[in-house]
Swiss-Prot record:
CDD domains in the cross-refs: Argininosuccinate_lyase
Pathway: Amino-acid biosynthesis; L-arginine biosynthesis; L-arginine from L-ornithine and carbamoyl phosphate: step 3/3
Single GO cellular component term: cytosol
Reported effect, D293N: 99% decrease in catalytic efficiency
UniProt effect for mutating D117E: 58% decrease in catalytic efficiency
NCBIfam families found in the cross-reference section: argH
Protein name per its UniProtKB record: Argininosuccinate lyase
Residues at the catalytic site: H162 (proton acceptor), S283 (proton donor)
Family: Belongs to the lyase 1 family. Argininosuccinate lyase subfamily.
Length: 468
């Protein structure tokens, strides 16, 4: 009875005793890796063709295997595939079903192939597809930020450092600051995709494939860019998983920052913007509440992604060479982060595209003290060394505070008492449009500079879209 219990395992021949039920539960991954069903079939079809070319399968056998795999694919797509208790993973499930459909010929499919090279191939195929979708959503978010910046380029609001009012900026400059960060994420994603695009299939358990399998044929069939150089490395390396999770971590840092900014700006204390009802929720007790749950969830999901990266790093750091069962942990991390990014990016795009800004409240929040730097720059343009100009401007701020007035209300005599370089044209300093318009250097908040940023980002997005 014990040996029969092992007979349905791909590895059961060597064992005489049955597996402990608790061990069965711990060992099984079919509950989540069935998401690999389609790519597992895709890989098996390619491998079957390579076996036929190598003379392991006859043409008739190949046709039966391909037909059976197509039937299994159809069952998965229709949601009628029946997973059995003995199916410990997606590879076992598909092979078991193939045998039910075409008989013992199914047993030839795994010739020279190990689940070690099979599973990493499946995961890479899954990630190739998923990362293309994520890339599309990411570029759409960047585009939404850029196009909104172009439309609302004339809106000016306070810029903050340390959450204290600092200098006037354009609302567009704020939007583009987040767009630029996301373009770096898009570039990083492109690099991850390059590393994923290396074929491991044909590496066997660790020593390679002894059956003269045409790996170039496999590469072409599965649309990989290149072939792995070393079989031991190919079946065990999960650098691409770590790189993907690292990319995701940085992306979520940027999205969390943007979410936090927008949450603050949406408070009644700031009143700079209002979120759409479509991306807000209410309170079960307080009828007046409109909560920015969409942004709060984006912010919180960052911690979830960070945890996935940390867990995989901990799994990998102590492993010896080649495959170890520890690597089974990679799939849940990848699936979870793929799902998280897919949802978060779409919600973020929805938030940005539908929020309403209050130009009036933004402009009301601008205060003369924010022009203290401009006052110092006024003196610099008069030939005063910056350190002296900075000190003079600070004294002007202090004098205004002492008098209980704003800095722009200081008389010319007051200013001259601080520096003789002040003259009647100093009044031009106390204008918020003039303030932002002086930052004409590349990357600045002047309208001309912001327009250049928009043009550059549009061009960059075009290139990244072509490479996606």
């Amino acid at each position: 009875m014990a040996s029969e219990a092992r007979g349905d395992k791909l590895w059961g021949g060597r064992f005489s005793g049955s597996t402990d039920p608790i061990m069965e539960k711990l060992n099984s991954s079919i509950a989540y890796d069935q998401r690999l069903s389609e790519v597992d079939i895709q890989g098996s079809m390619a491998y079957a063709k390579a076996l036929e070319k190598a003379g392991i399968l006859t043409k008739t056998e190949l046709e039966k295997i391909l037909s059976g795999l197509e039937k299994i694919s159809e069952e998965w797509s229709k949601g009628v595939f029946v997973v059995k208790q003995s199916d410990e993973d997606i590879h076992t499930a598909n092979e078991r079903r193939l045998k039910e459909l075409i008989g013992d010929i199914a047993g030839k499919l795994h010739t020279g192939r190990s689940r070690n090279d099979q599973v990493v191939t499946d995961l890479k195929l899954f990630m190739k597809n998923s990362l293309s979708i994520i890339s599309t959503h990411l570029l759409q978010l960047i585009k939404t930020l850029v196009e909104r910046a172009a439309i609302e380029i004339d809106v000016i609001l306070p810029g903050y450092t340390h959450l204290q009012k600092a200098q006037p900026i354009r609302w567009s400059q704020f939007l583009l600051s987040h767009a630029v960060a996301l373009t770096r994420d898009s570039e990083r994603l492109g690099e991850v995709k390059k590393r994923i695009n290396v074929l491991p299939l044909g590496s066997g358990a660790l020593a390679g494939n002894p059956l003269d399998i045409d790996r170039e044929m496999l590469r072409s069939e599965l649309e990989f860019a290149s072939i792995s150089l070393n079989s031991m490395d190919a079946i065990s390396e999960r650098d691409f998983v770590v790189e993907f999770l690292s990319f995701a971590t940085l992306l979520m840092i940027h999205l969390s920052k943007m979410a936090e900014d927008l949450i603050i700006y949406s408070t009644s204390e700031f009143g700079f913007l209002t979120l759409s009802d479509a991306f807000s929720t209410g309170s079960s007790l307080m009828p007046q509440k409109k909560n920015p749950d969409s942004l709060e969830l984006i912010r919180s999901k960052a911690g979830r992604v960070f945890g996935r990266l940390a867990s995989i790093l901990m799994v990998l750091k102590g492993l010896p060479s080649t495959y170890n069962k520890d690597l089974q942990e990679d799939k849940e991390a990848v699936f979870d982060v793929v799902d998280t990014l897919t949802a978060v990016l779409q919600v973020a795009t929805g938030v940005i595209s539908t929020l309403q800004i209050s130009k009036e409240n933004m402009e009301k929040a601008l205060t003369p003290e924010m022009l203290a730097t401009d006052l110092a720059l006024y003196l610099v343009r008069k030939g005063v060394p910056f350190r002296q100009a900075h000190t003079a401007s600070g004294k002007a701020v202090h004098l205004a505070e002492t008098k209980g007035i704003t800095i722009n209300k200081l008389s010319l005599e007051d200013l001259k008492s601080i520096s003789p370089q002040f003259s009647s044209d100093v009044s031009q300093v106390f204008n918020f449009v003039n303030s932002v318009e002086q930052y004409t250097a590349l990357a600045g908040t002047a309208k001309s500079s912001v327009t250049t940023q928009i043009e550059q980002l549009r061009e960059l997005m075009k290139k990244q879209k072509e490479q996606a």
